[in-house]
């Protein structure tokens, strides 16, 4: 069953740069090598909520978990340890329906 994954990073002060996001995307190489099971990816600032939000749709929880463990965490963990941000609040839920 398809799942939505929402990750939210608090906006810190007046910082509206996407430097960390862009570094992660480049390191992941998702444009050249899309992860299996990824259906939709969005990212942007939600000023009202005070967060930078990533919203993805995946074919299944298993596809998301594989991407998280095999590709995403190996890239972001060293960056966070070097002071490049903190872990987001992450929510995953099954979808009844989606359109892409």
Residue ranges: model-predicted function:
Residues 1-73, 82-100:
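Short S/T/G/P-rich N-terminal loop/turn motif that feeds into the first structured element of a domain
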